[in-house]
Structures are given as C-alpha cells and as structure tokens.
Amino acid sequence: MKPAARRRARECAVQALYSWQLSKNDIADVEHQFLSEQDVKDVDITYFRELLAGVATQAEKLDQLMAPFLSRRIDELGQVEKAILRLAMFELSKREDVPYKVAINEAIELAKIFGAEDSHKFVNGVLDKAAPSVRKGKK
C-alpha cells in the first residue's frame, strides 16, 4: 500500500475518532457512518479500521501511556489533539513496523491540518518526549 494511502487512513481515523469522542457512540457505528458518508477511495481502509478499532478499544491505556508527558490533564486536552495523540501513541506502542519518526511526523501534519494554530508544536513536544519511553529506544 502506498504511503499516501496510509496518510489518508490516518486523516480519516482522526476525523472518525473525533466524532467518536464527542458522540460517545459505538465505534462500529461511527466507522460505518464515516465510511458511508466520506470519500475514501484513496484510503488504506484496512489500516483505517485497525487504527480506529485499536485506539477506541485501548483509549484508556493510551491515555495512561501519554499522561506523564503532558503539561496538563488529559481531560483538559482539545478533542482534536486528544484524537491525534491517541492515534500516534497507538502507532508508537502497537505498530513497531511504523518508524517512530514517521508516527511523530504524521501526527504533526495531522495537527497542522485539523488542530488549533499551535497544536502541532504541542503534539510534537509530547511525542518527542514519549517516543523513547514507548519504543524503549527502538528506532
């Protein structure tokens, strides 16, 4: 699968996770609604589904994993930043085939697209601190 298809999968996953966080609907319903309403022709659907299900089922663990690296409590994070950080923490902790620099850079790009003005700086700071601990020194 092309890297662009994975990037699109991450973009779609962040949007769907944002919707899930706000609506508190079942993740399967959010996925179904998202896929039926959005243009997903250039998306790695398998990866999108893995990210969505992985983050949704492990959100609490991912929050605990990132908490030591945050400058504020998780419930004080914006919903967009929370979705992006959860996705990146999932990739860092569960997808060792994704180089940690790729996971961080993709999260920064997502924050530039979807986040508030300087959220990409916040995301970068959190992930730069978290990556060595989460990956235990693996590059």
UniProtKB/Swiss-Prot annotation:
The keyword Cytoplasm does not apply. One of its GO terms (biological process) is transcription antitermination. One of its GO terms (molecular function) is RNA binding. Keywords: RNA-binding, Transcription, Transcription antitermination, Transcription regulation. It comes from the Bacteria. GO terms for cellular component: cytosol. PANTHER family: ANTITERMINATION NUSB DOMAIN-CONTAINING PROTEIN (PTHR11078:SF3), N UTILIZATION SUBSTANCE PROTEIN B-RELATED (PTHR11078). Belongs to the NusB family. Involved in transcription antitermination. Required for transcription of ribosomal RNA (rRNA) genes. Binds specifically to the boxA antiterminator sequence of the ribosomal RNA (rrn) operons. This is Transcription antitermination protein NusB. It comes from Pectobacterium atrosepticum (strain SCRI 1043 / ATCC BAA-672) (Erwinia carotovora subsp. atroseptica). The gene is nusB.
